[in-house]
Amino acid sequence: MRKLFIALTFLLVPACLSAQLGGKIYLQRADSLLQRVLSLYEVKKYGLLMETYPRNPKQQITYTANTGSEVTQQEVSFLWPYSAMVSGCVSLYKTSGNKKYKKLMDKQIKPGLDLYWDTTRQPECYQSYPAFAGQNDRYYDDNDWVAIDFCDYYAVTKNKEYLKKAIALHDYIYSGWSDELGGGIYWCEQKKESKNTCSNRSEE
């Protein structure tokens, strides 16, 4: 149960894709997983989700560069695991056409995601922890995954809000390009020490 939320992307999206081949059972499992995450990880105060279940505010997160504001009492998840909900909703809606996933995306997941949006630095993008906690690190790969999901979502909904946001995110992502280290996009804007596969080949 503890890492269920973080694993959502790796379980939910493949399940949705498999539903096209394997029938309704995979779609049902994907929906069950989504509903369980929403139920167990809910943080009503912010309309967001916890990093782990059960909540552990003193946990040590090992997948960030740790150059921004220190999150000493972590109330909600970082952007990377939360963005799995975006991927999940988009995949479920694309696969099933069920408007409950569109409603969930537009009315709950996207408004929650907007709390991570950073307007204090240019180009604007999503930062790793909600803006209400101050400035935090910004990752090119995290924003890339969201931009791809927004493009996919626009393709099936024709909602230009998501297309505009995807374009804005790609403006940010391309700002991370440098010819140093053999060329490519950095991983973390605030700690330009590596150019990982996740920030350079995520489209594939």
Regions found by a protein language model. Give the residues of each.
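Active-site lining segments of carbohydrate-active enzymes
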Residues: 184-193
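Aromatic-rich carbohydrate-recognition surfaces in CAZymes
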Residues: 75-82, 135-157, 197-200
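Short secondary-structure capping/junction motifs at helix and strand boundaries
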Residues: 3-4, 19, 153, 157-164
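Bacterial Sec-dependent N-terminal signal peptides
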Residues: 1-22
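Low-complexity, Ser/Thr/Pro/Gly-enriched N-terminal "stalk/linker" regions
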Residues: 20-133, 160-183
